[in-house]
Every structure is written in C-alpha cells, then in structure tokens.
Regions:
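A structural signal for short loop-to-beta-strand junctions that line the ligand-binding cleft
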Residues: 6, 36-40, 87-99, 187-191, ...
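Short helix-initiation/N-cap motifs at beta->coil->alpha
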Residues: 41-42, 56-67, 114, 148-162, ...
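Extracytoplasmic small-molecule ligand-binding "clamshell" domains
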Residues: 2-80, 88
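A ligand-binding cleft/hinge motif common to bilobed small-molecule-binding domains
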Residues: 63-67, 80-89, 137-140, 161-162, ...
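Ligand-binding clefts/hinges and TM-proximal coupling segments of bilobed small-molecule sensing domains
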Residues: 4, 133-148, 189-190, 218-236
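Periplasmic-binding protein-like
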Residues: 98-105, 176-219, 236
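Alpha-to-beta junction loops
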Residues: 15-16, 51-54, 70-79, 124-125, ...
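Flexible hinge/capping segments at coil-to-helix
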Residues: 107-125
Length: 236
C-alpha cells in the first residue's frame, strides 16, 4: 500500500498546495513579488503551521487543477467548487464556505437584461474560462446564446470588459470584488441566484488517511471560529 501524503508531508517538512492565483479574493498572485495572497493562502498557511511544516504554493490553472492532484504535483488544492465531474477523479475535504452564482455585464448593456432567461437568447455572447465549473454551467443554462470560451490566464470577465462578450457568470465571492474593482461592471438583476455550491479542497481520491487528517483539522478550525475570522478579513 502506498504511503499517505500525510507521511510524505511530515517526513519532508513541506506541504505542497496547488493554486491558480486568479480567483480574487481566494488566491491572487502579486506579480511584483510573485507571492500569493488571499483567503486560501491564509487557510493553507495556518494548516502548514499547525502541521509544523513549510508551505509551498504550486502554480496551476483551472483546466489542470484536478490532474495535478491525481499526478501528485501537489498534496491538495486551495478552494474549488464541489462538482460531480471533479468527484470522479479526485477526493474533497469537508466544505467550509459556499458560493452562489450571478450573471454580470457592463453598465452600457445592463438595460438589455432582466433575469436569467433574458441571457438565453440568440445574439447574446456569454464569456467563460475553460475548465471552470462556470463553463459547464453557462453551456447548460444558455443553449441559445453564443458561449465564448477563453483559456487562462484570460478570464471571462475580461472578455465582457473589453466588449467582446456581453455577460459572464461568476460567484458572489468573485463578483463582489469585481464590482468594487471595475466601476462599469453591473450585476444583472435576477429573482434568485443559481447553483448554490459548497467549496472545499481537492485531495487524492484514494488517500483516506490524508483526507481524514484534513477533515478533522477543518472541523477543529470551524469550531474555533478560524474560518469565520478569515472570511471576515477578506470580506466574504
């Protein structure tokens, strides 16, 4: 039987965590220093500290996020939405935060949309990033619209800001940061958000020893109010 990632981390003294660095405020790469900052980074820094090991953030992107766990490029990932597709290949920790999805556009186009159904029309361009949960969602939700798929590091919202697309869908988490950062971004008015989704860390599917360790740590930190503190710090 292969040894657990837990043994490897403790013997080598390094916890390797895959992160994309493009999900504000969860994980953001500071191009000036090449360091990562954000909610995830604070969580992982604490996990490494509690384990008594060093933290190494390993750059990845959304389309290879799961593959990196499977291949052993890192011991776990930062926050990722739980999805049936990812569950086929990787394990997850317990969830510690949840998101829900909203559509966004720009101030010059916000008058064109009223609710989810108004987006699902011929002539509407919906932008999304390859390999994200959002890509699957928009293809399912808007079969009549034109889906514009871009590859990271490009992002769906950038296509909308540049005028090459009309709408992007993202979580309340990223949406709030984009509304703050870009004055011309507007949330499309909808009756209810869609796809409320728990967020968790991706882990090697068959490594139950490591999964158990991470889950027990999450429960401990939840009880101590740690996740609430970090969420408050990052405005979540």
């Amino acid at each position: 039987m292969a040894q657990s990632a837990l043994n490897e981390i403790l013997s080598e003294g390094v916890l390797k965590v895959g992160t994309t660095g493009d999900w504000n405020p969860m994980s953001v790469r500071d191009t000036a220093t090449n360091e990562y900052v954000g909610y995830d980074i604070d969580i992982m820094t604490q996990l490494a500290a509690d384990m008594g090991v060093e933290l190494e953030m390993v750059p990845t992107d959304w389309k290879t996020l799961v593959n990196g766990v499977v291949a052993g490029n890192y011991h776990m990932t930062g926050s990722a939405s739980i999805s049936p597709a990812r569950l086929k290949a990787a394990g997850y920790s317990h969830s510690y935060i949840a998101v829900e999805m909203f559509p966004f556009t720009t101030d010059d186009k916000v008058g064109n949309f009223d609710g989810w159904d108004s987006i699902n029309k011929e002539g509407v361009k919906v932008a999304t990033t390859l390999g994200t949960s959002f890509e699957k969602m928009v293809k399912e939700w808007f079969p009549e619209a034109e889906i514009v798929v871009v590859e990271a590091p490009a992002r769906g919202f950038q296509e909308v800001l540049s005028g090459r697309a009309d709408v992007f869908v993202t979580s309340n988490i990223e949406g709030s940061t984009l509304l703050e950062k870009f004055p011309n971004v507007r949330q499309v008015e909808v009756d209810t958000p869609r796809a409320p989704t728990p967020i968790a860390m991706l882990l090697p599917q068959t490594d139950q020893v490591w999964i158990n360790y991470v889950n027990s740590w999450i429960e401990l930190k939840k009880t101590q109010g740690f996740f609430e503190e970090v969420a408050l710090k990052w405005g979540l």
